[in-house]
Amino acid sequence: MKIADLMTLLDHHVPFRTAESWDNVGLLIGDEDVEVTGVLTALDCTLEVVNEAIEKGYNTIISHHPLIFKGVTSLKANGYGLIIRKLIQHDINLIAMHTNLDVNPHGVNMMLAKAMGLKNISIINNQQDVYYKVQTYIPKDNVGPFKDKLSENGLAQEGNYEYCFFESEGRGQFKPVGEANPTIGQIDKIEYVDEVKIEFMIDACQKSWAEQLIKQYHPYETPVFDFIEIKQTSLYGLGVMAEVDNQMTLEDFAANIKSKLNIPSVRFVGESNQKIKRIAIIGGSGIGYEYQAVQQGADVFVTGDIKHHDALDAKIHGVNLIDINHYSEYVMKEGLKTLLMNWFNTEKINIDVEASTINTDPFEYI
């Protein structure tokens, strides 16, 4: 399996297009044409993680947090530059799966909920997928070659199906005037043409490409085409809603999380003895969604990186919070390893996958 094949597999199961627009996911460092010798999953790509991959003989690291995020202005032999230089020197490929793994139904938030021992887990804050139905009109004799060109360039595909078009016949008319250079017809004379209306679906990201291809391969000098926007609720969403088997107090639930996740500290906002049943979870930094979670029926909102003033606002408004620290997302190391092994087994791919043993939490606790 080459890196390009691995990227295709990852994109199939955890589409990179579902990442937030501000995010930096995908192949950050590497060569798509090299063979994968082994995969190391990690929360962060630190120098220690790179050394671990080198020791194992693995040439691919898949990290949750992007190493290259805000931009790199120099590659010196220290700091982030040292990490990047070492990756390049040892021909190690670095792939980031950040918010696309956050919003995935099998992703970080699902992994956290399962690690906490919760049940009835479902995605919340579902994304809206945007598609376009494309319509254009073309002379009957040109239909086949035109569809072939669109299909060859990746359009009119639905899942595992290609060449997905709908056709309906009709009669078009036009009159070339002025300096027109018509493929069919004469200047100042109305022309009637047997035409076929061709329809097909595209993803939002294909819109400009579709327009370019239609203009390039349509026989008319000025082709007519429409893009009709269609929105559908996605399977992807930022956060999960889950339940405990039996009601417990907020304090007991916080203590239970600390034990289940094996993390050094947990903070909570709310009345210690308040009963908890439904839990909303957004790993990492999820503040901003706590009130929406309550409106959706959550008794407590679990996330990390909660600031003082956000906690105070929540306390004043009677919203229960539990801060499990950003590093709690480390559960994705084993979680992603399991997913990769399942995907590889299904495809009969024999590549070693290991979860990094390096603790990349920058904090020390007393």
Curated annotation (Swiss-Prot):
Keywords: Metal-binding, Zinc. The keyword Phosphoprotein does not apply. Zn(2+) 2 binds at residues 65, 326, 329. Coiled coil: none annotated. GO terms for cellular component: cytoplasm. The keyword Metal-binding applies. Pfam families: DUF34_NIF3. Signal peptide: none annotated. InterPro entries: DUF34/NIF3, DUF34/NIF3_bac, DUF34/NIF3_sf, N-reg_PII/ATP_PRibTrfase_C. One of its GO terms (molecular function) is metal ion binding. Zn(2+) 1 binds at residues 64, 102, 329. Belongs to the GTP cyclohydrolase I type 2/NIF3 family. Homohexamer. This is GTP cyclohydrolase 1 type 2 homolog. It comes from Staphylococcus aureus (strain MRSA252).
